[in-house]
Amino acid sequence: MKNKQLLCVLFPLLVACTGQRHQQQVSSESIIEEAVRKGEVLKGEIVPIDTALFRYAYRMRVQGDKAVILDLHNADYYYHVFTYPDFQYQSSFGKRGEGPGESIYAANIRFAGQWVLDDGKGRMYQYSGIAGGKTPKQEKDILLDKRLFRSLDFDLKDASTVVIPDYSGENRFSWASLSSGELLRKSEQIPVSDPELLRESAPAVAQGWNSFVSFSPDKKILVSVTQFGDRLDIYSMASQKHIGELGGDGEPQFKVSPEGYGLPAGRICYYDVQVTDQYIYTIYDGRKFKDIMKLADAYQQGGKILRISTHEGDVVKTYVLDRPIAGIYVDEAAGMLFGLDVNADEQIVKFPLELE
């Protein structure tokens, strides 16, 4: 993938108890170098599919015997349905376009309720029929409140509420109604180390702290990870406790442009996060932008570091993969990591995991 495509993906353009811990002080470069030296790199296996479909397979969601993969650059449809775990193609939906019911820029999909997000239009769509032998059908079309500013990721708190990172910088999260799209409330603060910068340039800070989010299956914790910094945050929905984990690569680094935009200036860090009943799984890169630019067309997008953490933020295991991946799905019962390699022609890859 070329660097101009990278930039398109990067910029489609206080609580009761708080704790911040500096847990992992080893840089991402050192982690990868050590794994290579010891011969401890986890080797992946390509999962073949029977049709040439993907251009930029970015997110994978699995529910029961079906999987949906979001492809950001597909010419016709954003979402593709497969059987799971054998990945037999079934159907596609989420037509790319500017017409009614079409999507300009798809951002994510969540199986609970079968909702998808179109940041380009500021809308959410709910589908039925996402299964083998069926044709997906759009059932609801919700226009999101304009006060949400930008909507680049989301997760569902319950059947009536969606959480979206707050890109205005006023808060960390926005909560909206799934029936009306109305903004219900905002919560938390961006935990930037320079509060004065947040006061002066809140939207730029929010862009520099662009985050991916994931609820635990029981909805008791909400986890966010930063795209441009080594920062993981865990928010308890019941106790309002907040745990912040700052890794060895530091918090997001960015520059404020004359126009007020937050331009990343440090590293590309987290690519995806998945929370299960037991663990938090994240895929991490850590390369510096200045080094990425030197690679030019040889640059491969994605992260090679899989971190497995407890719900309290303690890292219990770190894997180094043999290739970078952008999106992840961990099947704990099968002991398998499925990753999406956007640099290859065959983009679904699986890795064996040893989970306790």
Where are these regions (language model features)?
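Beta-strand-rich domains and repeat architectures in extracellular enzymes and scaffolds
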Residues: 47-77, 281-285
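Structural signature of eukaryotic scaffold interfaces centered on beta-propeller domains
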Residues: 58-62, 107-110, 152-158, 205-218, ...
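Short, conserved, GDST-rich strand-edge loop motifs in beta-rich repeat architectures
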Residues: 282-300, 348-351
